[in-house]
Amino acid sequence: MLYPKEFDVIVVGGGHAGTEAALAAARMGCQTLLLSHNIETLGQMSCNPSIGGIGKGHLVKEVDAMGGAMAAATDEAGIQFRILNSSKGPAVRATRAQADRVLYRKAIRTRLENQPNLMLFQQAVDDLMVEGDRVVGARTQVGIDFRARAVVLTAGTFLDGKIHVGLDNYTGGRAGDPAAVSLSARLKELKLPQGRLKTGTPPRIDGRTIDFSVMEEQPGDLDPVPVFSFLGRPEQHPQQLPCWITHTNSRTHDVIRGGLDRSPMYTGVIEGVGPRYCPSIEDKIHRFASKESHQIFLEPEGLTTNEFYPNGISTSLPFDVQLELVHSIRGLENAHILRPGYAIEYDYFDPRGLKSSLESKAIEGLFFAGQINGTTGYEEAAAQGLLAGINAGCYVRERDAWTPRRDQAYLGVLVDDLITRGVTEPYRMFTSRAEFRLSLREDNADMRLTEIGRELGVVDDVRWDAFNRKRDAVSRETERLKSTWVNPTLLPEADAVPLLGKGIEREYSLADLLRRPEVRYEALVALQDGRFAPETPLADDTMLAEQIREQIEIGIKYHGYIARQAAEVDKLEANESTKLPPNFDYTEVRGLGFEVSQKLNQHRPETLGQASRISGVTPAAISLLLVHLKKKGMGRAAAQTSATPVAGNGQEAA
């Protein structure tokens, strides 16, 4: 049957990508439908009970800056918060939280059910409705047709998913949930390029059977307790709990080696490639054979359960081997396994078949987000979901898509990596992937993205007002520090030495003094009983005031480095803004070479910058392409822009 109401946007899947996509489209005013096989598992944390980390926390902050749900839900569900790399520079500091699974799911469900313009419906999707080269809706397993102008597909690991425990396997999207077999078959009929990937999860342990007395306690940060959302407050956090650390040992490693003959990974049963940066314990023992032990973090799953997640021993070994493996670890000698670990293979679709908006190049109005694009991790999925939801809304409203640049957001780095380089293994975000990471910090995600989010319609009045107060205060106080001058008379040696280590010999601005590594803003404005403090407080709200102080201090201390990075961005901007014709035949470019023209014809980059990052496309090839475009007058940007070739792989254009 045809459902009587037509929607603007349909989102298929209710995981981290799907929920952010649905919320974003609805915030833009689009009539949105979220279809899930089970609305009880919306926002489910299928693997580890944590959010954030290096690179990942940056993505969560960016999602939050644009009104997304993940950070706020984590503040309500987080049972431990830590700032990683706190002793290092601000570019690589990252927030990480342990979350209560039940509270997190509840926080997401509450937002979904109370979001205007958003409706939920429980049914598995078996088919996409496609007319010509355009998607027009989705069909459920009982034959209900829902029509929409745009569809966002966020199927996670469910597409033809196969779960492995030892040499036994069965179809499933995750433990306890069915696989999306029919939908996977339908997508293959559409001739979209696809492959198989694999991920895994460890056995879960009953905390009542763990001997914590022989383990190292790992508490969270308590003074102060961090928050994830820019609007978050520590008072929102539930009770805080510690994690615990133990290690594998030589006996553990012997058990694992003895079970490799029944490992689906080492007997060829699993064909999909697993995540490099979250390897199974089998992989660790095999790849790092000389390492005597590996760290294991025992992470609580929540406040109302005894279940623990042993982070570090993801495995698909047979259950009897898993049991012996767990019992070989100190503190787990008598542990009871509540759920076996397993690996899951699933279909993904080559993200090089997507535009930078995450819309399919082959099927108009169809957007992909999350693990279906070859990524791994809740945070990467949520960020893609936000972008796909926004651009589905832009598509419906006939507005230009929003495509964040690499210098603008980690989300821009993520999407650009996916669509230009593709994936051969599950992709996860690290700060090292960003060339401009000094400008892409957690602390300034709102300064980079909230105004854009407001223009797109995804940032509400509460966030916008808080952001404006912060931005105005940062600007006002930074200018005051630059224009307030002190000399040896105003700042005598007795006052200067505790702050600077020596007296000042000439006139300095307060900004000059703050630029010194050892000087903190709080100490500077506290000099001489607050003589150099602003006339009014930075903000009435203590959390907002702390954010303002942080922005002021980082902005002044790192001004020179940030300015140099901005100059590098300007040099590359010409390439990024030079559009390439969508149906251009690259074999027409003389001297380009067969391999390069073949790759460009295959991947269809949207800009010269994207073309430069495709494997095998050299700076010489980019120069030839630019000359050809100018000569033919193809595209206003190409005709008017003097683009700068960027570094390639050193090969010549043949």
Swiss-Prot record:
Function: NAD-binding protein involved in the addition of a carboxymethylaminomethyl (cmnm) group at the wobble position (U34) of certain tRNAs, forming tRNA-cmnm(5)s(2)U34.
One of the record's GO molecular function terms: flavin adenine dinucleotide binding
Binding locations of NAD(+): 274-288
Cofactor needs: FAD
The protein's assembly and partners: Homodimer. Heterotetramer of two MnmE and two MnmG subunits.
InterPro entries: FAD/NAD-bd_sf (IPR036188), GIDA_C_N (IPR049312), MnmG (IPR004416), MnmG-rel (IPR002218), MnmG-rel_CS (IPR020595), MnmG_C (IPR026904), MnmG_C_subdom (IPR047001), MnmG_C_subdom_sf (IPR044920)
Binding site for FAD: G13, G14, G15, H16, A17, G18
The organism's place on the tree of life at top rank: Bacteria
Localization (cell): Cytoplasm
A biological process from GO: tRNA methylation
Keyword field contains tRNA processing: yes
Stated family: Belongs to the MnmG family.
GO cellular component: cytosol
Record-linked SUPFAM superfamilies: FAD/NAD(P)-binding domain
Key word Methyltransferase present: no
Species: Cupriavidus metallidurans (strain ATCC 43123 / DSM 2839 / NBRC 102507 / CH34) (Ralstonia metallidurans)
Keyword terms, alphabetized: Cytoplasm, FAD, Flavoprotein, NAD, tRNA processing
Protein's name in the database: tRNA uridine 5-carboxymethylaminomethyl modification enzyme MnmG
